Amino acid sequence: MALARAEGNRHIHAMNNPRIDASRITIRRGEAADAAAIAVFGERTFLETFGPANDPAHIRAYLDDAFGLAQQSAELADPDTTILLATFDDMLVAYAQLRRGPLPECVAHADAIELQRFYLDRHAHGSGLASTLMDEVRATAAALGAAHIWLGVWENNPRAIAFYAKCGYDDVGSKTFDVGTDRQVDRVMVAPVAAADPSGRIR
């Protein structure tokens, strides 16, 4: 059912709104018919999160390249890419994207898969959806044969860095990320696919 958002993309968390009920969220694999909804959602959430801190020309260049309909269609068709869509009353409210590809030098695990995107609607923060979606990311990564997950997160996004640390991701180094022609620095974080319980034991 169609929905009414290249190399590693940044991860987004949005503002609190109690209207999203995580118990009514459905998570499924993305399909070809979802390309337009993902393109619109991805551009909007990226712009809301990173637009205020970046030059508009750089942001526009990045959005045109990363979130065009053709690009989303290609990513949905890519056998190395798996997209998870979270819907609430048939509306797209979050999505995650896993991809097999080259690893940064600081990632020591050959079995790692990249969490390329992890985007939430600004009305979903505080609903518990981020944790639910991360659990599904781990399960999907395991089903794809990965034992570790890695991601890149902007060094100037402490809120997202804190979220990933809470989810068990460790900072292992850095890599560059181009927003238009503006070369920026991302922290690289890695976690085992198996989640840790509050005591720190892997389960």
Positions of the model-derived regions?
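Conserved beta-strand-loop-alpha-helix junction that forms the acyl-donor binding cleft
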Residues: 151-161, 178-183
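Conserved active-site tyrosine of GNAT-family acetyltransferases
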Residues: 164, 169
